[in-house]
């Protein structure tokens, strides 16, 4: 059988031709082998393998060159090319044909079931059929790879058919080409398939896979031209049922065209029934049934009068779908019809010329999503028309479908959007300057924003619907207005905004139905120019039942807007710019609803001017009309006008736009607020009066500023966060009302003269400072600074604190009304003698309550006082005013400076700080019973009133200093038997624990716990004379002492602690060393150093050091009268040279030790009874004498401690021998002295002899 193609359009007959070719009379009969490359008679060719050479085949008219039934386990079932080989199959004239049928390569890594070409090899194929070829890997029919060189086309296929070819485990069911330039013209791809293994990495491109994987960004990507080519019934288990394309770096370019030569089917080329599974079980729109494009740019170039149809609306939407992230451009003046679900195409799409028709609803929703996600600020979706190609005409025709575009739909002036009856296009963003026509509907989606420019963009005979929160902006000029007046556009506001502010020719006084027919359930109209006159709602503002009506937005720039009376719109009135003139409440919409007036634009000046006595309170609404702050706004009330409004409200949209905004009250009239407010705006009263009619009209306002000549009247109880300190007007606190400062700015002082009236100023903010003269009552709920303030009213300080503390003493607070205490008074004061400067509270009215006083001692050294330091002055006439206030110092009731504690005492109605305890004089004896009528003597000279006896009150810390100094000098004292060598011992360990207490200076109860550990040992010893003996040793010790001092006057307590170390030498001499009797001498010398702490609650801790020499010389005579009894008189002189360092105490006092070194003497008698049982009882009697007092000097005041200058001691003990060389000694000692001095100490020592 002979088949001859007379014209290219006969390709549609190829399926039947192939069937006949394989019949008994067809190719099956072609058994002769080819005898060269010039085929004159049909023949069967063998497998061709070319390397770097050229092979051109020529097939005579009516003859067949057949490559069939070849099976190979390597790439290229019929033809293998490498190293730039060139392979051509061309008809000699027109009808010579080539057939590749049933060729197979096995193995998943072997490619090209019919032809394999690599390394820039070239294929040029004309009049060719590929049928039933199978590749184990890529390219069921053809595999071609190159390097994207700039030379000729790598793969050229013309007038061909690919049918039933399979890529078993790869890509490209018919053709796989990588890094190549490809030209396909007049080709049919039918029923080709790309499969994949379980790795799900292959199976792309059911018909063709064109890919570029060159990672060199400087190397150009390839391109593919697909002209007059049909794709039907192709499938991919992966992506791209008909076409898969992608690139690694620069986009791969594909041109899919239908040119002028295509005439079949009336010039309509149909691609259909292609599908991709995306590795799933069935067709997937995300996989791209027709095409999946990654980093590729695809151009659909359709010639004039031609149509390319992709998909069939009768099929599932996934079939013939387009998916991916690349760029699609429509060029050519012909038509492109998309009938599938293309919502998984998220790249950009441009219609530059011709028409694109969408045959399925919601089929391009997500165009532009990939780029918009990457760069939301530069977001594009679908573009219709072009600025560069302005001579072209581009159109998107949705017909009667329903289309939604998530991202921008942009139409240029040469773009057209056609929506037929029943159709709808929903947009979220973008603009359109071209033509929007048809009987369908354009919808601006909820919260969307869209711009229509020019009358041509409003040529729909259907509606433009603006949904809730959406904004439709119209732009135009005089010509556009004329066109719209001839054919008005219907706009339906369903909660949206119609913005006409950029429609430059909308004139004052015109009605919006001069070009627009506005209707809907609710919405906002933003007007243009000077006046928006709303006299009802005819065709303009229509409110549905149960819903808010259309809002009125005034956006008048520098102009004014006047509203007609009896407006019936149900929404709010919003002022974005300009001035809204108000003379009647009914101008602002239906008074049954009484919707608020809202200031909305932060960038523009917005004013509401009230020109007559407008009372916005409505009986039907039950409230006044509120003023809502979303931006700065000004309320101007003309002179003589008194107007009542509802509340000053926060931003009800939830955007908190009132924060940072300011309401300014201007004009000489009065603005009265009749409901509690919520705004956080600042409020400025520049002129006239702002008055409250109910409580808390501004409780959350960030600040209130009242300018010179302006007035704020409370009218009721008001909470105000903060008064602006630079205010210079008047704040009138009405009688019976309070103004409470809840969050006052404490960084600057507030001028008290701002306030007047018969009400009460209440400070509820810690740290507020008032200055000057306050002409109203004051209540302090929190800390309030009132240095040098005069209160011409009552001062109530029951729960807060009044402070005059500023680091400078001598300030006054004068109260010319009644003073009621209960809180705290904080003062600065010098703490010296009677002439110390101090802050004072001066009271000129009745007083009551108990006030706690806190004194900050800014300077002073502490001195005894007589009268004291006056801090509270009751200056009123006691015969006319009651003085029942009580004052007491905070905490312990005392304040310390230096060595003295000051307390607060009342004297003749005034209150003083005194550093003495006052001992009242003894009362006089009662008058005796007079004798009857004695002759009176001349009046005797009356005795003067007895002067009270004053005793200074010492601070308890003084006792702590004395304790530490005494402990430092006493801790390491020893007698002869207390160290090694003193009683024949070689090594001695001594542990001492003691406790003493006494009264210092007649008022400080001293207590001290002492503990000491000493270790001593002999270094050298020798003979002295006949039987005398001497010894020299060393000693070291550690002492830890803790105590306290309690004031018997104030009850205060100070704790003290010191711990230290000592090292030194010991020496002993015995007259009769062996007998241990007769005269002896003992001495020691030690250096001691201590770390000391003294602390008092609320007064900090003092840290200081002490160190010095202590030494002793002791003598005695040991007498043995017999029977083991020892009698030993002793005398000891002890040098005490431990001195404390000078230091500054926590109360800033300078503390030093006033007396120098001291000499202590001891006279004693030691006795013991040496028994035969190795236990020796002992008894010691001692008398101690200190010639000097222990003295501390604190800020020039000397405090002496004479309590322990003389004391006696009884000590009993026992010594036991553990072995011949080791013995233990223990004793207990009791001391008593003057001023209740008593000490108990225990001693334990272990001695070793060898």
Curated annotation (Swiss-Prot):
It holds the Pfam family AC_1. The keyword Heme does not apply. PROSITE patterns: AUTOTRANSPORTER (PS51208). Residues 919-948 are annotated as: 15 X 2 AA approximate tandem repeats of [DTPE]-P. GO terms for biological process: cell adhesion involved in single-species biofilm formation; proteolysis; response to UV. One of its GO terms (cellular component) is periplasmic space. The 'passenger' domain (residues 29-785) can be replaced by other sequences which can be targeted to the cell surface. Disruption phenotype: No change in cell adhesion or biofilm formation. Residues 914-951 are annotated as: Disordered. Residues 980-1250 form the Autotransporter domain. Keywords: Cell adhesion, Cell outer membrane, Hydrolase, Membrane, Periplasm, Protease, Repeat, Secreted, Serine protease, Signal. Residues 1-28 form the signal peptide. One of its GO terms (molecular function) is serine-type peptidase activity. Sequence repeats lie at residues 919-920, 921-922, 923-924, 925-926, 927-928, 929-930, 931-932, 933-934, 935-936, 937-938, 939-940, 941-942, 943-944, 945-946, 947-948. Coiled coil: none annotated. It comes from the Bacteria. An approximately 170 kDa protein is detected in the outer membrane, while a C-terminal 55 kDa fragment is detected in whole cells. The full-length putative autotransporter may be cleaved to release the mature protein from the outer membrane; Pefabloc SC, a Ser-Thr protease inhibitor prevents the appearance of the 55 kDa C--terminal fragment. Residues 928-942 have a biased composition (Acidic residues). SUPFAM superfamilies: Autotransporter, Pectin lyase-like. The signal peptide, cleaved at the inner membrane, guides the autotransporter protein to the periplasmic space. Then, insertion of the C-terminal translocator domain in the outer membrane forms a hydrophilic pore for the translocation of the passenger domain to the bacterial cell surface, with subsequent cleavage. Finally, the mature protein remains tightly associated with the bacterium. Probably an autotransporter. Upon overexpression shows increased adherence to polyvinyl chloride (PVC) plates, increased mature biofilm formation. This is Probable autotransporter YfaL. It comes from Escherichia coli (strain K12). The gene is yfaL.
């Amino acid at each position: 059988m002979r088949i001859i193609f007379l014209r290219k359009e006969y390709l549609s007959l190829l399926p039947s031709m192939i069937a006949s070719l394989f019949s008994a009379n067809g190719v099956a009969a072609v058994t002769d082998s080819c005898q060269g490359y010039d085929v004159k008679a049909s023949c069967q060719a063998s497998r061709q393998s070319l390397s770097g050479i050229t092979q051109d085949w020529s097939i005579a008219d009516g003859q067949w060159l057949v490559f069939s039934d070849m099976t190979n386990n390597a790439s290229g079932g019929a033809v293998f090319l490498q190293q730039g080989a060139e392979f051509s199959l061309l008809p000699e004239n027109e009808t010579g044909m080539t057939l590749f049928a049933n060729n197979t390569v096995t193995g998943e890594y072997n490619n090209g079931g019919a032809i394999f070409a690599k390394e820039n090899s070239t294929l040029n194929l004309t009049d060719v059929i590929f049928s039933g070829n199978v590749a184990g890997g890529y390219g069921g029919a053809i595999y071609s790879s190159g390097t994207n060189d700039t030379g000729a086309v790598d793969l050229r296929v013309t007038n061909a058919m690919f049918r039933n070819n399979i890529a078993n485990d790869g890509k490209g069911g018919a053709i796989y080409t990588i890094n190549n330039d490809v030209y396909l013209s007049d080709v049919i791809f039918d029923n080709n398939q790309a499969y994949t293994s379980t790795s799900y990495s292959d199976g792309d491109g059911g018909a063709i896979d064109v890919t570029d994987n060159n990672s060199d960004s400087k190397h150009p990507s390839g391109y593919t031209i697909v002209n007059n080519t049909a794709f039907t019934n192709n499938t991919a288990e992966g992506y791209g049922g008909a076409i898969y394309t992608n690139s690694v770096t620069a986009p791969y370019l594909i041109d899919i065209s239908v040119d002028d030569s295509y005439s079949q089917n009336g010039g309509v080329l149909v691609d259909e029934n292609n599908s991709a599974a995306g590795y799933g079980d069935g067709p997937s729109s995300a996989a791209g049934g027709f095409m999946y494009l990654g980093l590729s740019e695809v151009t659909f170039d359709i010639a004039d009068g031609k149509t390319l149809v992709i998909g069939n609306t009768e099929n599932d939407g996934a079939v013939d779908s387009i998916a991916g992230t690349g760029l699609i451009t429509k060029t050519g003046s012909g038509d492109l019809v998309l009938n599938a679900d293309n919502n998984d195409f998220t790249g950009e799409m441009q219609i530059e010329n011709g028409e694109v028709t969408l045959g399925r609803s919601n089929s391009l929703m997500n165009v532009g999503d990939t780029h918009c996600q990457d760069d939301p600020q530069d977001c594009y979706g679908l573009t219709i028309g072009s600025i560069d190609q302005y001579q072209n005409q581009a159109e998107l025709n949705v017909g009667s479908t329903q289309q939604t575009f998530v991202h921008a739909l942009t139409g240029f002036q040469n773009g057209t959007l056609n929506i037929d009856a029943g159709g709808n296009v929903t947009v979220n963003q973008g603009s359109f300057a071209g033509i929007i026509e048809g009987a369908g509907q354009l919808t601006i989606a909820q919260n969307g924003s869209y711009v229509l420019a020019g009358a041509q963009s409003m040529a729909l005979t259907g509606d433009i619907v603006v949904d809730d929160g959406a904004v439709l902006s119209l732009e135009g000029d005089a010509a556009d207005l004329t066109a719209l007046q001839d054919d008005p556009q219907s706009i339906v506001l369903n909660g949206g905004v119609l913005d006409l502010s950029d429609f430059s020719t909308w004139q004052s006084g015109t009605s919006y139905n001069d070009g627009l027919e506005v209707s809907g359930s609710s919405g906002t109209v933003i007007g243009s120019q000077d006046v928006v006159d709303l006299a009802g709602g005819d065709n303009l503002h229509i409110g549905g039942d149960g819903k808010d009506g259309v809002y009125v937005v005034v956006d008048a720039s520098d102009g004014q807007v006047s509203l007609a009376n009896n407006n019936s719109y149900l929404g709010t009135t919003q002022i974005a710019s300009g001035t809204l003139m108000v003379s009647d409440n009914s101008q602002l919409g239906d008074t049954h609803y009484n919707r608020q007036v809202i200031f909305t634009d932060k960038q523009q000046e917005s004013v509401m001017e009230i020109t007559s006595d407008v009372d916005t309170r409505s009986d039907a609404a039950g409230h006044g009309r509120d003023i809502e702050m979303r931006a700065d706004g000004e309320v101007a009330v003309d002179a003589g006008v008194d107007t009542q409004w509802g509340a000053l409200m926060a931003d009800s949209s939830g955007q908190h736009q009132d924060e940072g905004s300011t309401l300014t009250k201007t004009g000489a009239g009065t603005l009265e607020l009749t409901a509690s407010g919520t705004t956080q705006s600042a409020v400025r009263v520049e002129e006239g009066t702002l008055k409250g009619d109910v409580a808390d009209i501004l409780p959350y306002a960030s600040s209130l500023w009242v300018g010179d000549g302006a007035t704020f009247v409370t009218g009721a109880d008001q909470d105000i966060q903060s008064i602006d300190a630079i205010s210079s007007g008047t704040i009138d606190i009405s009688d019976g009302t309070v103004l409470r400062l809840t969050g006052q700015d404490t960084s600057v002082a507030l001028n008290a003269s701002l306030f007047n009236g018969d009400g009460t100023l209440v400070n509820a903010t810690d740290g507020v400072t008032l200055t000057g003269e306050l002409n109203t009552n004051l209540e302090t709920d929190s800390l309030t600074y009132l240095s040098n303030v005069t209160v011409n009213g009552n001062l109530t300080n029951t729960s807060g604190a009044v402070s005059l503390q500023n680091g400078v003493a001598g300030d006054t607070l004068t109260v010319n009304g009644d003073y009621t205490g209960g809180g705290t008074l904080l003062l600065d004061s010098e703490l010296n003698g009677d002439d110390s400067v101090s802050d004072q509270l001066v009271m000129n009215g009745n007083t009551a309550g108990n006030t706690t006083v806190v004194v900050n001692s800014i300077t002073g050294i502490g001195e005894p006082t007589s009268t004291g330091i006056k801090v509270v002055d009751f200056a009123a006439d006691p015969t006319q005013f009651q003085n029942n206030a009580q004052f007491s110092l905070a905490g312990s009731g005392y304040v310390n400076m230096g060595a003295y504690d000051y307390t607060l005492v009342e004297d003749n109605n005034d209150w003083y700080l005194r550093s003495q305890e006052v001992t009242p004089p003894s009362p006089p004896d009662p008058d005796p019973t007079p004798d009857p009528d004695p002759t009176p003597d001349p009046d005797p000279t009356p005795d003067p009133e007895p002067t009270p006896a004053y005793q200074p009150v010492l601070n308890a810390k003084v006792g702590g200093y004395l304790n530490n100094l005494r402990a430092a000098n006493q801790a390491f004292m020893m007698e002869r038997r207390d160290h090694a060598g003193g009683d024949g011992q070689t090594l001695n360990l001594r542990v001492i624990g003691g406790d003493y207490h006494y009264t210092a200076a007649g008022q400080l109860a001293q207590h001290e716990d002492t503990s000491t550990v000493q270790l001593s040992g002999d270094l050298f010893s020798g003979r002295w004379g006949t039987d005398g003996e001497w010894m020299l040793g060393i000693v070291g010790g550690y002492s830890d002492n803790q105590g306290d001092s309690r004031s018997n006057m104030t009850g205060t307590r100070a704790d003290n602690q010191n711990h230290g170390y000592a090292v030194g030498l010991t020496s002993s001499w015995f007259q009769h060393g062996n007998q241990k009797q007769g005269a002896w001498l003992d001495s020691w010398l030690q250096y001691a150093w201590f770390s000391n702490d003294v602390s008092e609650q609320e007064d900090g801790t003092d840290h200081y050091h002490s160190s010095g020499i202590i030494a002793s010389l002791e003598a005695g005579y040991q007498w043995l009268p017999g029977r083991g009894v020892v009698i030993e008189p002793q005398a000891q002189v002890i040098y005490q040279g431990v001195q404390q360092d000078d230091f500054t105490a926590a109360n800033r006092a300078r503390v030093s030790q006033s007396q120098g070194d001291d000499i202590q003497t001891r006279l004693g008698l030691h006795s013991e009874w040496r028994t035969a049982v190795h236990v020796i009882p002992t008894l010691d009697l001692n008398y101690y004498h200190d010639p000097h007092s222990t003295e501390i000097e604190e800020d020039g005041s000397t405090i002496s401690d004479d309590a322990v200058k003389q004391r006696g001691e009884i000590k009993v003990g026992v010594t036991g021998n553990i072995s011949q060389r080791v013995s233990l000694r223990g004793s207990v000692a009791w001391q008593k002295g003057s001023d209740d001095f008593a000490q108990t100490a225990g001693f334990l020592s272990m001695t070793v002899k060898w």
